[in-house]
Amino acid sequence: DPQEIKQGGDTGIMITSSESYSKPSSNLSASRKGNFFIGNAFFKQPWVVAPASTDSRDGLGALFNVAACQSCHVKDGRGHAPMTAEDDADSFLIRLAMPATTDKQRQQLKDSLIEKVAHPMYGGQLQDRGIQGVPAEARIAVQWTDKTVTFADGHIETLRAPTFNLTNPGYGAFDDEMMVSPRVALPMIGLGLLEQIPDEAIKKQAIKTNNANSDISGKFNWVMDPQTGKVALGRFGWKAGQTKLITQNQSAFN
């Protein structure tokens, strides 16, 4: 509701600590809060290699990015890129894609039947860890270069520009034409509310910003819903590549 003072309405909480993203909505019933805390426990605890005594969260690997959801979404907030070339990419990942080379692939992309053309060996997302005895697909390294920017009023600011490198490929050399897309883990707050926004409201907002000739504009993204097999409005992820929370979660587990 544009007139709502609180962005989250009755779900909002009045906590401003580092734990504020990790609290249940204030209007949850007691039973729903119980569901929240069970889910939150799974979110924080690491998955382990099967077989294991903790069979409710075994099955890690063989390749993976991190062992726990919380490792990427620290305190349910935004992640960060590695600070140095030696740092692990704990809350950061690399998406992969190849150029479309056939008429079928080009048509599938045009019709939103596929998000991208995945790499034939490494798939659509690089996994930089493996269980014991399984080589990781590669190591993600970053180098930062200072870049000076001068604003219109003469103010000078120094920004950092990253260069990402994929080293130690575990399953064959990378193709020269392979495209990479660095992604920082997104915050978890408000995703349930985002799922409740009607499609028409999102479309209307995109049209409104584009017609305003402003510096900020957007367009809605059509993607294939794997549950229905139909093209639907994307909502989740940096590029709105998932239609529902359940498919976003499934993608993160895959």
Predicted segments, located by residue:
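Basic, ligand-binding patches in group-transfer machinery
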Residues: 39
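Bacterial Sec-dependent N-terminal signal peptides
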Residues: 1-8
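Extracytoplasmic redox metalloprotein regions
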Residues: 10, 14-36, 44-254
